[in-house]
Amino acid sequence: MDTREINGFASAARSISLPTQPNYSSKPVQEALKHLASINLRELCNEAKVERCRATRDLASCGRFVNYVLNPCGHASLCTECCQRCDVCPICRSTLPKFGDRLRLRLYYECVEAGLISRTHEEASQDSDEDEHQLAADVHRLYSLFDVAMNNNLISVVCHYITNVCMDETAVSSDPVIAFLLDEVVVKDWVKRTFRSTLAELQEIYNLETKEMQAWLDKLLRCSKQVAGICSVLEVMESAFKGSVSPQLQDVQTLRENIGKTKQHLDIMVWCIRHGFLDDVRSRYSNFTSWNALVGERKSNAVKRAWPDAVDQSSDCSVQSASLFIEDALENLEREPEYSQEIGADLEVGRLQKDKRSFLRSKIEGTSGSYPFENLRTAADMLFLHGGSDLVVAKQAIFLYYLFDRHWTTPEKYWKHTIDDFAATFGITRHSLLESFVFYLLDDHSEEALQEACRILPEICGPETYPKVAQVLLERDNPETALMVLRWSGRDGVSELVSIGEAVTALRVRVECGLLSEAFTYQRTLCLKVKENNLKNGAVKHASDDLDIWSWTEWMEILVNEFCCLSIRRNLVDRIIELPWNPDEEKYLHRCLLDSATDDPSSAVGSLLVVFYLQRYRYIQAYQVDLRLQKIEEAFVSDNQIGEEVMFRMRSQSHWRKELVDRAIDILPVIQQQQVRSGQFSEMEDASEGAKKSDLPDAPDMITSSVPFATTNSVFLQSANNARAREPVANNGSPFQPGHMIGNASHDLSHGRLFTNANRGQKSEVRSVTKNLKFGEMSTPFKDLNRARGNSQLQGKRTEESSPEVNVDRYIENNMSSPYLRRITANNPVTVKSSSNHLNGSSQKPESTFFGTRMQPDKDNFVDLDDPMDMSSSLKDNNNNVLATESRNNSGGLRWRSDETSDDEDELTSFGSMPVKGRRRRRFAAR
């Protein structure tokens, strides 16, 4: 049947025809296919060549077409008539048998008789008498045999023809026609011819309506098999050229790329046609305009919630390149290269695209501007006709994202079976299915979508988890889940080097969860890992995002600055100054805290920087910082109008800071005191300091010179992991519950503010591990002051910090219904003693923490004295410290806290301060 009438649309389908199918149960068809499958491939050229009878008749050659070969020798040299009167083969002179079958039908004519090759092709080949047309006829007959092999699941015949004949250097012939048929160019031309005809058929079918296309599904499936066959042929041909650089190889690769995209697009079109392009499945969007507006709103929310870029600080309001997951995925789809002139425009897969406007829109607005797709057909065309064919998995994931976006929030009974069928059709695993779903949910700015994503994440997190997942969770104020994602994906350590962006995200997550000691250990260990890698490779080089190159000192600067800025934002400066910073890290800590004090002199950050040096018995540097802070405060007061309360706080801070610094200077020898107070201290060394002195002048914004790495306390480096392992990480099985707090406690903080006030009426208790060192009855930051053993390295004493943002107990109670939290609770063996164990009549003093007021832990809950982060061992022999003795003579006074409140403040009124003109903006000010 040449034409078909489909649902009354005879004119639309008239140009599309289905070839008459042979009767595969008949013996001639079976014999022909068996002969084709078992033939010696070197004889395939001889079978395809047009032969004429070589017998002489009346002193001339017979010249008739030869349809048979001689049985003894297999030469096609005699026609049927001449075979009856000749006794020998004209070619090899072998004797013909006198009895039995002398002739056997040639393979080509055997296929014609069986109906595998149309007789019109056979007649056309015999009508060509001229030499140039005769060569074309021979090639056409070989193509016909290839077509028979392709249409009958014998494409391996063509593949073996390439490897065993075309690529065999011994396969040669003196016959120019046979020599031409032995060349691989013939096979490549056959692939182009077949692909061209397939494109024409597909284009006609794709232009039909949905109902019409459904009637041609059988034809589409047959085309899919053909395209898959010629694609496998090109793979074999490409492997034969492997290792060589030639135009032929480039031509084959380009052709294979086009055929691969056609196959992928054809498969997705078959699925869409089967489901009627989901015309019967209602979308949750009323129209395309509303959908497009919602995607724009998602993009706007992503920009608003994006964190500042810790790497690129070129602008005041520098933020990370905020983007949605769908935008990143579309950007990764590479555009196809320019086609060579040899292939021709008739081989471009763009012919199959129905609507050219969507492609032009993506060219104008960028790749990400093509989303959302107007309909299912546009989605199939945009994804599978463009971009590399090797990105088929990513394209399928984007298609799933589109389906989830189109139908989520509607009843699952209407669309879930469609998603499941898509996954089953294309072999998509449940993990990949849920991953696409999570990407959509994290792009959706609704709280419902975020909760659903948090419920699914435990099932799909692993080593291959996209690093941006943790970043987006952090941006959406869910650092606890982000931390779990890092742990589940194996990125909570530094076993492997990561990009600088991933490292910053991991640091931010830990700080936001209150894990300051873990964040500090992470940045320290990572920088050492980068330095070791630089030395091992013999070059200060590490490839990160977009192939940027960073030295280990630049890694340290970025991570330490980020750590300090986050601590300032969360009012945790009083905790980070107690960490064991090495001299290289101190340089960036000093700069960051001093910049913060310059931007906001009314805060306690500058005073805490003085405390940082006093705790390390580096009195001269504390004196220098105090002098600089006094100048900054004087300039701030003179240039701005500030409230009385802010003025009182600043004066109190300055008074007590100066008094403590003066007392510290009094400890120095008299000669040094005179030199310091006379300003002759620039070339002096602090005799009580064993560590390297950090530079006090302003350093440039980006330190590019290589800073020598100072040897740090090896005990800390060796025991960092053990100390972290000893820290309780869960309460009732949750990884978010902190361990016992040791050192200065913090308070509940308001999220999103750079500097916030503490809870009204709440006093912070600052305690030492052993309470061996006391400065009178007043509360001062020097309660934890201790002298390091033999050097100025501060040995930290904190075992675990907890998030001041989230009440963990309340978080667990509200979220224990989630299945992944229940699983963690069941599997986590770590438990923490409940605070209810403390009796009401206990003599223990309540400890103020950012989780509320609780009793101080029992003695058996204290940190082991051998812990390198424990400060108590260094305090045992310092009860008679001069500073402590002098401090006991004072009563009352201002107590510096990171929340910027004094003990006497019952109610606080916020006073806005005018910005200082001409002052350089710091990166943390943009937070």
From Swiss-Prot:
Q: What is the effect of changing residue 75 to Y?
A: Loss of E3 ligase activity
What EC number(s) does its UniProt record assign? 2.3.2.27
User: Does the keyword Metal-binding feature in the UniProt annotation?
Assistant: yes
The kind of enzyme this is, by top-level EC class, is transferase
Query: Could you tell me the keywords of this UniProt record?
Result: Cytoplasm, Metal-binding, Nucleus, Sensory transduction, Transferase, Ubl conjugation pathway, Zinc, Zinc-finger
Enumerate composition-biased segments (Basic residues).
917-927
**A single Gene Ontology CC term:** nucleus
The compartments listed are: Nucleus; Cytoplasm
Q: Where is the composition biased (Polar residues)?
A: 832-851, 878-892
Q: Give the pathway annotation.
A: Protein modification; protein ubiquitination
GO BP terms in the entry: negative regulation of DNA-templated transcription; protein ubiquitination; response to cold; vegetative to reproductive phase transition of meristem
By its UniProt entry, which InterPro entries does this protein fall under?
ELYS_dom, HOS1, Znf_RING/FYVE/PHD
Q: Where are the zinc fingers (RING-type)?
A: 53-93
Q: Where is the composition biased (Basic and acidic residues)?
A: 797-806
| Other noteworthy facts | Loss-of-function mutation (hos1) in the gene shows an early flowering phenotype due to a constitutive vernalization and a reduced freezing tolerance without cold acclimation.
The record's domain comment reads: The RING domain is required for E3 ubiquitin ligase activity.
Functional description taken from the UniProt entry: E3 ubiquitin-protein ligase that mediates ubiquitination and subsequent proteasomal degradation of the transcription factor ICE1. Acts as a negative regulator of cold signaling pathways. Probably involved in recruiting the NUP107-160 subcomplex of the nuclear pore complex to chromatin. Controls flowering time in response to ambient temperatures (16 and 23 degrees Celsius) and intermittent cold, probably via the regulation of FT and TSF levels.
Q: What is this protein called?
A: E3 ubiquitin-protein ligase HOS1
Q: What is the lineage of its organism?
A: Eukaryota, Viridiplantae, Streptophyta, Embryophyta, Tracheophyta
Q: Which gene encodes it?
A: HOS1
